[in-house]
UniProtKB/Swiss-Prot annotation:
This is Nuclear distribution protein nudF. InterPro entries: Dynein_regulator_LIS1 (IPR017252), G-protein_beta_WD-40_rep (IPR020472), LIS1_N (IPR037190), LisH (IPR006594), PAC1-like_LisH-like_dom (IPR056795), WD40/YVTN_repeat-like_dom_sf (IPR015943), WD40_repeat_CS (IPR019775), WD40_repeat_dom_sf (IPR036322). The keyword Repeat applies. WD repeats lie at residues 112-153, 155-195, 199-239, 243-282, 285-345, 347-386, 391-437.
Length: 444
C-alpha cells in the first residue's frame, strides 16, 4: 500500500474504512481493524462522523469516471473510423484501395428503365454495366461515362438476375427472369441472344457463372431447385433440389466454383458441394426470407477468423470458409460455412437486399429497402462505420462490385492473401446499385 498511497492518503483511507464499518453496524470488525491499524484515542466519534460516506463517494465517483472513460474511448474509435474513411485520409494513404469507401454522392445516376431495377452486373474487362428491370429489358451502360449503349429485349416478364462469365476471351452475359427462362447474350455480337435455357417450372431468381467450369452456370428458382447448365449446348446437366422445395431467392458460388451457398423462403441457408450436388451445411438463424447470400473472399479471412475466435485464419486457397447472408428480418449474419453463427449485424431498418465484400477484405457493403448503403468494418468486429442515407429515392434492390480487369484469378486476394510480403492487389474501386426508383447509381 505504501508504494501506491502516501502516508496521509493511507491514513485517510483507513479512517474512511472504519467509518464505513460503523455505518453498516459492524462494531466488532471495526474494533479489530482499529487495533490492527494501531489507531489511538485520537480516532473518536467526531473523526468517524467526518469520514462517513467518504468511501461510498469515492466508489461511485470511480464508477462514474469509468463510464466516462468508456464513452470517451467509444467516441475516439468513432472519430478514428470517420477519419480513416474520409477523403483526406485516403489521400494520406496514397489512395490505398483496401480502405476505399464510397462517397455519399454517386458518380453517375443512370436513368432509362421504366420500372424497378432488380439486378446489375459488371463486364469483367470493359467498362460495361448491365442492369435488369421489371420492365422486361436489360440495359447496357458505359459506367465510366455514365451513358447508355443499348437495350436488350427478349424476356417477356421482369428480369431478376444477371451475370457475366464464360470462357476467357468469349465473355457472355446471362440473364434470368420471371418468364421461367435464362437467356445468353454475346457482347462480341452486339449482345445477340444466342441461346435460351428452359427447364425451370417457376420464376428464375438468380443466375451465376461457375469458375470451376467456364461452360457452366448455376440458376436458382422459385420451383425449389438449383440447376447447372452447359452454356455451350444449352442443356441442364444437374438438378439440385432443396430439402423443403421452397423458393430459392439467391445462389452464389465460391471463387473457385467448387461450392454454392443458397437461401430463400424457408429461412435456411444451405452450403452445397458442386461435384456431388449434396448439401454440406445448413445455416439456421434468420427469422424471415433470405434475400442474399455470398461467400467471403480469402482477403477477409483474417478479420472473420478473429470474429470467430479462431487462433489463425484458414488458408487463402480454401474457398468455403465464411458466409454472409441478408434477410427480410433486417439483419445481416456472418457464419462459418460449417454452420456456426459468428455475428449478427444490426442497423438496417428494412429488408436487406444485397451484399458484397470489399475485395480488400476489410469491409462488407449492404443495401436495403431502407434506401441506404451501409459499410461494416470486419476488422472492428463488424462495426457499422458508414451509412449512405438516401443512396436512392426508393428501395435499393441490388449491389455489385466491379471486377478487377486483366486477371485470371477470380479472387482479388488470390493465394497471396496470407503473405505479408506479397504485392498488394489492384482492383477497381467501383460499385453499382439498382433501385425501385428505376435508376442505377455508380459510386467510384
Amino acid at each position: 500500500m505504501s508504494q501506491i498511497l502516501t502516508a496521509p492518503q493511507a491514513e485517510a483511507l483507513h479512517k474512511a474504512m472504519l467509518a464505513y464499518l460503523s455505518v453498516i453496524n459492524a462494531p466488532q470488525t471495526a474494533e479489530t481493524l482499529r487495533e490492527e491499524l494501531h489507531f489511538d484515542e485520537s480516532y473518536n466519534e467526531a473523526t468517524c462522523k467526518k469520514f462517513e460516506g467518504v468511501l461510498e463517494k469515492k466508489w461511485t465517483g470511480i464508477a462514474r469516471l469509468q463510464r466516462r472513460i468508456n464513452d470517451l474511448e467509444a467516441e475516439v474509435r468513432s472519430l478514428q473510423a470517420e477519419l480513416e474513411a474520409s477523403p483526406s485520409a485516403a489521400r494520406a494513404k496514397n489512395q490505398d484501395p483496401t480502405n476505399w469507401l464510397p462517397k455519399p454522392s454517386s458518380t453517375h445516376t443512370l436513368t432509362s428503365h421504366r420500372d424497378a431495377v432488380t439486378c446489375v452486373a459488371f463486364h469483367p474487362v470493359f467498362t460495361s454495366l448491365a442492369s435488369g428491370s421489371e420492365d422486361c429489358t436489360i440495359k447496357i451502360w458505359d459506367w465510366e461515362l455514365g451513358e447508355i449503349e443499348r437495350t436488350l429485349k427478349g424476356h417477356i416478364r421482369g428480369v431478376s438476375g444477371l451475370d457475366y462469365g464464360g470462357q476467357k476471351g468469349n465473355t457472355l452475359l446471362a440473364s434470368c427472369s420471371s418468364d421461367l427462362t435464362i437467356k445468353l447474350w454475346d457482347p462480341s455480337k452486339d449482345y445477340a441472344n444466342i441461346r435460351t435455357l428452359s427447364g425451370h417450372d417457376h420464376s428464375v431468381s438468380s443466375v451465376r457463372f461457375l469458375t470451376s467450369n467456364d461452360n457452366h452456370l448455376i440458376s436458382a428458382s422459385r420451383d425449389g431447385t438449383l440447376r447447372i447448365w452447359d452454356v455451350s449446348t444449352g442443356f441442364c446437366v444437374k438438378v439440385i433440389k432443396s430439402a423443403t422445395e421452397s423458393w430459392i431467392r439467391d445462389v452464389s458460388p465460391s471463387f473457385d466454383g467448387k461450392w454454392l451457398v443458397s437461401g430463400g423462403r424457408d429461412q435456411a441457408i444451405t452450403v452445397w458441394e458442386v461435384s456431388s450436388a449434396e448439401p454440406k451445411a445448413a445455416l439456421l438463424g434468420h427469422e424471415n426470407f433470405i434475400e442474399c447470400c455470398v461467400f467471403a473472399p480469402p482477403a477477409s479471412y483474417e478479420h472473420l477468423a478473429t470474429l470467430a475466435g479462431l487462433k489463425k485464419p484458414p488458408p487463402a486457397t480454401s474457398s468455403c470458409e465464411f458466409v454472409a447472408t441478408g434477410a427480410r428480418d433486417k439483419t445481416i449474419k456472418l457464419w462459418e460455412a460449417r454452420g456456426r453463427l459468428i455475428k449478427t449485424l444490426h442497423g438496417h431498418d428494412n429488408w436487406v437486399r444485397g451484399l458484397v465484400f470489399h475485395p480488400g477484405g476489410k469491409y462488407l457493403f449492404s443495401v436495403s429497402d431502407d434506401k441506404t448503403i451501409r459499410c461494416w468494418d470486419l476488422s472492428q468486429e463488424g462495426r457499422l462505420v458508414k451509412t449512405i442515407s438516401g443512396a436512392h429515392e426508393h428501395f435499393v434492390s441490388c449491389i455489385r462490385w466491379a471486377p478487377s480487369p486483366n486477371t485470371d484469378n477470380p479472387d482479388p486476394a488470390g493465394e497471396k492473401a496470407g503473405k505479408k510480403d506479397a504485392v498488394k492487389p489492384s482492383y477497381r474501386c467501383v460499385i453499382a446499385t439498382g433501385c425501385a426508383d428505376n435508376s442505377v447509381r455508380v459510386f467510384s
